[in-house]
Amino acid sequence: MVSIKVSLADFIVKTEEGWIPSDNCPALDRFKTKTEKELLDSIKKEGADRASIRKQLFLTSISNKRLTQLGGVPVRDIRTSTTIPSSTRNLITDWLLNIFNDEESGEEVESAIASKYPDIFCSADKISRVAQRLENRRDRVHEDGFRILSATMLAIDSDIATEGKCEIVRATEDAIIAKFEPVSEHLCIGNPRGVFYKAFPIKKEQPMVYGVKALLGISNRDFIMNHGHGHLRTVPYSEINNAVRSFAKKNEAEIKRIRSDSLSPNAGEKFINMCDMLLQKEKIETVIAKIMKSDKN
């Protein structure tokens, strides 16, 4: 099992009058606008930049024939079949509608999606953790929605302020460490993850010597990964298999970039070896076995 994804289109769709909630009605899939048909034809072509086309489809007004009593139906290519708890769906939908329909920043958000967001798909776990923050009316997630959305969608590096719900558990000279508990059952999309930690550097591009020592101690020496988003993350032993498989889906250029990132040496020798093995096209089963064996010992 690899990381579960959700799409922004699972929550909201664009119409001529603005953004409205998404609905699911396969019977209406047959109705498409001319623009949607052209984009859907282009996404099927060999070598197509599917992520870019998905963003265009998301930012295109849907056919009026796909409106229902509850909202609008996104085209099949930009929605997922992921089961989303109603509590999470309601919280995230209302939050996104406030962001996208804002008179002052709405256009800026759409422009950012087109030019800066890598895709409209994102981690279901990240979305679940944003929903946890939304339950607290005093949380900054209600005022700083655009920036938190951008971090959730990996358009900008995250920090403590833009992460999903977490608790600061340690601060060193060079890092702040946060603990992420399993997501509450009523908000969790997919299977709950175990406890993990993230270390955020005090100064960008500077190694986290004391922070990593603290991270290893707090996490009981869990495997540490750098995903290239400006922080380090621990992975519980039982989740290494999924984590490595998910990381291996990155393209070669991205893995090389992360391998040479200033934070990667702090992640440790096992992480560097994993990157090297993936770049050398080792079988994924071999990579996982080596990482888990060394981690166990």
Swiss-Prot record:
A GO biological process held by the record: viral genome replication
UniProt-listed Enzyme Commission number(s): 3.6.4.-
UniProt-annotated location(s): Host cytoplasm
A GO cellular component entry from the record: host cell cytoplasm
Catalytic residues (positions): H231 (for ntpase and rtpase activities)
Signal peptide stretch: none
Keyword Magnesium: yes
Region of interest (RNA-binding), ranges: 212-247
Domain of life: Viruses
First-tier enzyme category under EC: hydrolase
Record: residues binding ATP: D119, I120, F121, K198, H227, G228, H229, R233
Cofactor(s) the protein needs: Mg(2+)
Subunit structure: Homooctamer. Interacts with VP1; this interaction is weak. Interacts with NSP5; this interaction leads to up-regulation of NSP5 phosphorylation and formation of viral factories.
Role noted for this protein: Participates in replication and packaging of the viral genome. Plays a crucial role, together with NSP5, in the formation of virus factories (viroplasms) which are large inclusions in the host cytoplasm where replication intermediates are assembled and viral RNA replication takes place. Displays ssRNA binding, NTPase, RNA triphosphatase (RTPase) and ATP-independent helix-unwinding activities. The unwinding activity may prepare and organize plus-strand RNAs for packaging and replication by removing interfering secondary structures.
Family in the record: Belongs to the rotavirus NSP2 family.
Entry-linked HAMAP family: ROTA_NSP2 (MF_04089)
Name of the featured protein: Non-structural protein 2
Species the sequence originates in: Rotavirus X (strain RVX/Human/China/NADRV-J19/1997/GXP[X]) (RV ADRV-N)
